[in-house]
């Protein structure tokens, strides 16, 4: 895999607060190599290590995108939800930003069935068929569409398992991470000082609570994906 320059700037990362970890009492000792100091009761993340792993992740997603691979971005906590949707839409990736439904990947047949139902209902809505139904029946179907849009809207165009999954918060999205591990789907994961760096294929040490931190990391990854997609289009 070719290494590229992704304009990852330490000062920019500091401004985004990427270096602020959790309180020193809430930490995973496995994170010791990624921590540079303690300050006012919190661990400070070593941004040089962050830059290195973020660069590796950008190389990986660029390479995958340049070969037409598909990505899923997962981040369901309120602070991350909007950034996840914006990043995914920009890079034409699938995303989950409301709630991870257990078995979404490991029980793909059920997920696929729900997606087919969702697509059929949306088609009926667009063609005006719902307007011809009795009010009560139409109301039931509209509620179903709304429910499916909330939980499956970000993956409505997904036709198979993703090739790479990007996870914004390891602890919040532990079920999603475990499903990826079970299916051997490569993962890129933001890890704060209370996380286990050994679970993901590429772990990026970073503050997973600050919106600015999440957004910066996602923006770098999305830029690399977009560059890879452009390369794929040029060469196909």
Curated annotation (Swiss-Prot):
Pfam families (UniProt xref): Ribosomal_S2
UniProt cross-references to SUPFAM superfamilies, sorted A to Z: Ribosomal protein S2 (SSF52313)
InterPro entries: Ribosomal_uS2, Ribosomal_uS2_bac/mit/plastid, Ribosomal_uS2_CS, Ribosomal_uS2_flav_dom_sf
MF GO annotations: structural constituent of ribosome
GO cellular component: chloroplast; mitochondrial small ribosomal subunit
Primary localization class, coarse: plastid
Keyword set includes Hydrolase: no
Any single GO BP term: translation
Subcellular location: Plastid, Chloroplast
Keyword field: Chloroplast, Plastid, Ribonucleoprotein, Ribosomal protein
The family this protein is said to belong to: Belongs to the universal ribosomal protein uS2 family.
Record HAMAP family: Ribosomal_uS2_B
Name of the protein: Small ribosomal subunit protein uS2c
Organism encoding this protein: Morus indica
Encoding gene, per UniProt annotation: rps2
